[in-house]
Design a protein with these regions (language model features):
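Fungal secretory targeting signals
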Residues: 1-20
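Low-complexity, Ser/Thr/Pro/Gly-rich disordered linker/stalk regions
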Residues: 18-128, 139-143, 148-154, 160, ...
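Beta-strand acidic-aromatic groove motif in beta-rich domains, primarily in extracellular
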Residues: 128-136, 195-198
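Flexible glycan-contacting loops in extracellular carbohydrate-active proteins
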Residues: 212-244
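Short strand-turn-strand beta-turns centered on an Asx-Gly dipeptide
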Residues: 202-206
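Short tryptophan-centered beta-strand motifs in secreted/extracellular beta-sheet-rich domains
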Residues: 29, 118-120, 180-192, 199-201
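Short, aromatic/His-centered strand-loop micro-motif at the edge of beta-sheets
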Residues: 162-183
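Beta-strand-rich interaction surfaces with strong enrichment in secreted/lumenal proteins
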Residues: 100-110, 134, 169-176, 213, ...
């Protein structure tokens, strides 16, 4: 270690200041090549989840997942199957759309010594049948789950934390319908009991809600950005193209 680096480390330690580490930089959507350094295509478990969209995307197919100019674009289009297939995931809805989902290669695990800040700017559809989200979910089992952004076919963003399937805290915040970009942030910090995680949610720099994840400390989480359709957002969904954009996304831990 260079002497000056050692001196800074000692100073930070004496002062009780923890260094910040960038997990996902704000330029991860600057190009496909950079995107592929930090993100994977589809869900961690495959192409299907609990809505009416089947995810499509790969290093050779960017018709539904694209990255450029620090912006991720997810696109959902109706399918034309006379007899639609069904999702392989519960509750096995009929597939009416092809769409896009990505998840971060780095998992997020809050510990007593590692808190996380997740930030991004979102242009989200709010029409009935559109179900975009920006969320954390357990790598093993379920819950934990925390939804930083979830739009379920209404002009609201839902901040959610699932402690069980029935013990859920939700805070709804009004969301504009003009597809303008607005920022969302979540700060995840371990509580002093060493088991629970405090989650502070903000929109456009204003604190909106504080929720608590029971037993979330030490649990590895996937970070997912998806454009799901119908399901909890109502039906029928749009008959044309739906676009969901995320820009300047950054994840840090201290």
């Amino acid at each position: 270690m260079h002497p000056s680096t050692f001196t800074l480390a000692v100073f930070l330690g004496v002062c009780g200041v923890r260094a910040q580490t960038t997990v996902i930089p704000s330029n991860s959507f600057s190009s496909i090549a950079t995107f592929e350094q930090y993100w994977n295509y589809l869900y961690p478990w495959g192409s299907d989840h609990n809505g009416a969209a089947r995810m499509v995307g790969s290093s050779s197919d960017h018709s539904h997942i694209n990255a450029a100019s620090n912006t991720l674009t997810l696109i959902a289009t109706p399918t034309s199957n006379a007899v639609p297939p069904t999702s392989t995931a519960n509750p096995h809805p009929a597939i009416h759309y092809a769409s896009g989902t990505v998840y971060a290669k780095s998992q997020i695990t809050v510990t007593a010594s590692a808190s996380y800040t997740l930030y991004g700017e979102f242009s989200s559809p709010t029409a009935v049948g559109t179900w975009p989200a920006f969320w954390l979910t357990a790598v093993a089992g379920w819950p934990p789950e925390t939804d930083i952004g979830e739009w379920k076919g209404t002009a609201n963003n839902w901040f959610n934390t699932f402690n069980t399937s029935s013990i859920v805290r939700s805070d709804l915040v009004a969301w504009p319908t003009d597809l303008s970009f607005h920022s969302l942030q979540a700060v995840l910090t371990a509580e002093s009991n060493g088991a629970d995680v405090r989650i502070d949610f903000s929109m456009d720099g204003v604190h909106k809600a504080t929720q608590y994840g029971a037993g979330f400390v030490g649990k590895a989480l996937w970070l997912i950005i998806d454009l799901q359709m119908e399901g909890s957002s109502g039906s029928p969904g749009p008959g044309g193209t739906t676009t969901y954009k995320v820009r300047n996304l950054k994840v840090t831990h201290t």
